[in-house]
Amino acid sequence: METLLVVLHVFILFLLILGLFVMQKKHVSFSKRVFTALGLGIVFGFALQLIYGPTSNIVIQTADWFNIAGGGYVKLLQMVVMPLVFISILGAFTKLKLTKNLGKISGLIIGILVATTAVAAAVGIASALSFDLQAIQVDQGSTELSRGQELQQKSEDMTAKTLPQQIVELLPGNPFLDFTGARPTSTIAVVIFAAFLGVAFLGVKHKQPEQAETFKKLVDAVYAIVMRVVTLILRLTPYGVLAIMTKTIATSDLDSILKLGMFVIASYAALITMFIIHLLLLTFSGLNPVIYLKKAVPVLVFAFTSRSSAGALPLNIKTQRSMGVPEGIANFAGSFGLSIGQNGCAGIYPAMLAMMIAPTVGQNPFDPVFIITVIAVVAISSFGVAGVGGGATFAALLVLSSLNMPVALAGLLISIEPLIDMGRTALNVSGSMTSGLITSKVTKEIDQGAFHDQSRVIEAEEA
């Protein structure tokens, strides 16, 4: 009987996927299809949970089958992350028109990303203190304890090395190993390797322009192919979101989620506040935030539902281009934003965790010196955070271990991790685009006509 029910559930999922496919054939917008998938997944997941319970064999077996679509989609995103990061950084150098501004452009982008991460940390701290979040308020179940032990082990592996040794670890001793994502710092290592190749290209361009042009054509060709692969994966987003949301809701412990509801509310209050700050920064830079919102919605929706900053990179770059950002700057901002200064995952989240855990170690969370220390540590630790699932955890481990706090307590939030990760990812992408826009405005490279052309709104299929 159980097998028949599992088959029935898989058949229902197949019918829902078929419905989404029909919507695509009717040219329903990408954003609408993704939100439809999100809604269907939530309803279907709740139905399975209410009928059978999250721990029943039927739900567990059904979730296992659903994971072929959901987990497969995530694997495909992970597959393309390193090639995407590498070729985007390298492509940014080959597409850069004014090499004399290279230092200023890259410095501005990185500076804005890190500065906004520091602001995001302050917002996260304010939110945690306002909502009086404390780790001792949360009960530890077996899942939370298991997750805590896993994080503790990861932290011990990281803290076994001194700070100078950890800095050296950022460098790509073997770039081919880092292309496999084997190390926690693989993403930033690939960025550094690509940047070295890019700088070398600029040098060759002056001395041997013919060879540089050949290399540029090769990079442009690989860039086009990688972007095409990513576009094919992006088109699977509604189906992946449907399967992921159904599985997540069906297997979630609703009691734990309700108990942690205050943390979810506080997190989204901080995320929304930081997003408003992005809009204010654009306004102060002389850019219309309403136009930004209209053009940014598709990529922010994709980031929210996919929970992958890296997967959103092509759409991120195309969206910046539609707002008049030059191709080179758009590539730099999008690519650097994957591993440096993620406002959500590396800013708000670790800062809120630090405030929650502080009272458990006898630290007064309202101490100004402690607050400044947390902001500084968060900003510095924001280098090297990966743009695919797990980046926030890595950032939290770095921050908490640097502050000598028990990292195991971060495992308390495992039940709501997917829920808050959606908002964090959208904020990461917004921060990346904001840095590109402001940099373009400051360097006077922005195309104002393209920015104000509200007919240029990019959907995922166009990425």
Curated annotation (Swiss-Prot):
Give the main localization category.
membrane
Q: Which UniProt keywords apply?
A: Amino-acid transport, Cell membrane, Membrane, Transmembrane, Transmembrane helix, Transport
Q: What's a single GO CC term here?
A: plasma membrane
UniProt subcellular location: Cell membrane
> Is Transport among the key words of this record?
yes
Q: Which gene encodes it?
A: tcyP
Give the coiled coil ranges. Answer: none
The family classification in the record reads: Belongs to the dicarboxylate/amino acid:cation symporter (DAACS) (TC 2.A.23) family.
What up-regulates or down-regulates this gene?
A: More strongly expressed in the presence of methionine than in presence of sulfate. Strongly inhibited by seleno-DL-cystine.
Membrane topology value: Multi-pass membrane protein
Give the matching InterPro entries.
Na-dicarboxylate_symporter (IPR001991), Na:dicarbo_symporter_sf (IPR036458)
Organism lineage reads as: Bacteria, Bacillati, Bacillota, Bacilli, Bacillales
**Molecular-function GO terms, alphabetical:** L-cystine transmembrane transporter activity; symporter activity
> By its UniProt entry, which Gene3D superfamilies does this protein fall under?
Sodium:dicarboxylate symporter (1.10.3860.10)
- Residue ranges spanning the membrane: these are 3-23, 34-54, 73-93, 105-125, 184-204, 225-245, 262-282, 338-358, 369-389, 394-414
Please tell me the species this chain comes from. Answer: Bacillus subtilis (strain 168)
What does this chain do? Mediates uptake of L-cystine, the oxidized form of L-cysteine. Although it is more specific for L-cystine, it could also transport a much broader range of amino acids and sulfur compounds including S-methylcysteine.
- What is the name attached to this protein's record? L-cystine uptake protein TcyP
Source organism superkingdom:
Bacteria
